[in-house]
Amino acid sequence: MSGHILTVGLIVVVAHCATLSSSASTIPIQSQGKDFPVPFVSEQTDDFYDDKFYPDISDDNINEVVRDNGRKGGDRGRQSTPSGKESHPSATQTGGRRPSQSPCGESRPSGSATSGRRPSQSPRGESLPPATLAGRQNSRQQDRRQNKKQPDLSKYKNSPARYIFTTGNVDSGKTPDEERIFRTNRAEYVLATGGPYDNYLVEIIDGPNPNDISLKQSTTMGGDSKLILDNPNRNTIVGRIKTFKA
């Protein structure tokens, strides 16, 4: 009886050793480490992983490898989105160009450029409002248009005045800073523009009676003054304007 038990035990031990020797080369994937063989792909047999070392991997559940089909610049395939997460689209760039940037890497603000010019300033260094600049430009343009239309008035250079209009206190013996001869038949004619404290002397050489015309002086927002000859009957007037700067 004891001999039978020993024989059966010996058979069990031998069978167990045989099982261990046959499974010595099997390495479950859970125990894979850096010293174990890496799975390889066999395109001829579609046997994606080595069954000798990784028998617990099911080849039937492995997706087929996306092949290049002869195209250049390999296709990297699509990336799957993990469950429970939403994929966010990448930002679209217009025309394939990056937004304009300064040398420091900061985005340049949009808008119109100033062409490198500084805003106009007053003699004290203060910036003038746009309305003042527009008023000055209009006055200068109007003066230029009037001067272009002036005929040759040199014959009136030494002609005496019939009567005189003045603004402020004008010293008749003082030499004027500016002097010119004019001719007009407009209802309103700009004689001169200047500072708010400038004085003017207007000599009428040829024209209507003094009661038919008058002078008026206005000051713009920027502080400039404008001397206007009021001629409601539109009579032809020839005169001389003298400007005395303050």
From Swiss-Prot:
Compartment(s) where it occurs, according to its Swiss-Prot or TrEMBL record: Secreted
Start and end residues of each stretch annotated as Disordered: 51-160
Domain of life: Eukaryota
Lineage of the organism: Eukaryota, Metazoa, Ecdysozoa, Arthropoda, Hexapoda
The keyword Signal is annotated on this UniProt entry: yes
Principal location: secreted
Subunit structure: Interacts with human DSG1. Interacts with human DSG3.
Biased composition (Basic and acidic residues): 65-78, 141-155
Signal sequence coordinates: 1-23
Tissues where this protein is expressed: Salivary gland (at protein level).
Protein name: Salivary antigen SP32
Stated role: Down-regulates the expression of CD86 and HLA-DR on the surface of lipopolysaccharide (LPS)-stimulated human peripheral blood mononuclear cells (PBMCs). Reduces LPS-induced secretion of IL-1beta/IL1B in human PBMCs. Reduces LPS-induced secretion of various cytokines, such as IL-1beta, TNF-alpha/TNF, MCP-1/CCL2, IL6, IL27 and IL-1alpha/IL1A, in host cultured macrophages probably via inhibition of NF-kappa-B signaling pathway. Reduces production of IFN-gamma/IFNG, IL4 and IL6 in human lymphocytes activated with PMA/ionomycin.
Composition bias, Polar residues: 79-124
Keywords: Immunity, Secreted, Signal
Additional record remark: Immunogenic; triggers antibody response to Phlebotomus papatasi bites in humans. Immunization of mice with the protein results in the development of antibodies specific for mouse DSG1 and DSG3. Exposure of people to Phlebotomus papatasi bites results in the development of antibodies specific for human DSG1 and DSG3 the titers of which are correlated with those of anti-PpSP32 antibodies. Interaction of the protein with human DSG1 and DSG3 may trigger the production of specific anti-DSG1 and -DSG3 autoantibodies and promote the development of pemphigus vulgaris, an autoimmune bullous dermatosis.
UniProt record, GO biological process: immune system process
Membrane-crossing segments per the record: none
Gene designation: sp32
Any one annotated GO CC term: extracellular region
